[in-house]
């Protein structure tokens, strides 16, 4: 089971996730509406998450040495000709109808299926993604995942990976990622299906 922890805002959080051998780390860039938005300089060595980036932004990210780019909006026109970063195309439950046009896009290495408001901690009806064909591309489930529901989500959907942000944060009184919640989430997500549920 691959695990992605998204929305890191502080370099020390990278240490927390590295201790747990998390597969992917995401940062929110070029989206100031998010409370997790940070600068490119702050995010240079970890994976990023963008909402409809410009071609220039994608090229900057590629030059910074990232391995993937997660895009919530449209993939920029001319992407395949100008950039070589594999795309994790994010879909929220409101734009699932757009899935077929991306399933054949050679730039798309995988999908992230999320709630209507990514990063909100809201769970969506997982049955909505059960009919999505699981092809040779990575299939991540996101949207309100936390210690209490990640094992059930994995058992129900059988994704290649899970993506969490608010589910491993401290809470209302303190911002940032909680190392204990990260440890517990990773442990639960990596349990064989059927154990501890």
Predicted regions and their residues:
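Conserved N-terminal beta1-alpha1 strand-loop-helix module at the mouth
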Residues: 1-197
């Amino acid at each position: 089971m691959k695990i992605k922890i998204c929305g890191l805002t502080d370099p020390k959080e990278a240490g927390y996730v590295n201790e747990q051998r998390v597969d992917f780390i995401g940062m929110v860039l070029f989206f100031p509406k998010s409370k997790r938005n940070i600068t490119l300089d702050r995010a240079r060595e970890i994976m990023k998450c963008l909402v409809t980036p410009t071609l220039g932004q994608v090229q900057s990210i590629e030059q910074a040495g990232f391995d993937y780019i997660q895009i919530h909006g449209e993939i920029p026109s001319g992407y395949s000709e100008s950039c070589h970063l594999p795309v994790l195309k994010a879909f929220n439950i409101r734009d699932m109808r757009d899935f077929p046009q991306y399933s054949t896009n050679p730039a798309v290495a995988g999908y992230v299926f999320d709630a209507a408001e990514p990063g909100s901690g809201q769970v969506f009806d997982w049955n909505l993604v059960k009919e999505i064909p699981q092809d040779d591309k990575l299939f991540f489930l996101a949207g309100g995942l936390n210690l209490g529901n990640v094992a059930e989500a994995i058992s129900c959907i059988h994704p290649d990976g899970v993506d969490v942000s608010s589910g491993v944060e401290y809470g209302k009184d303190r911002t940032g990622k909680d190392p204990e919640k990260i440890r517990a989430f990773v442990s639960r997500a990596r349990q064989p299906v059927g154990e501890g549920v």
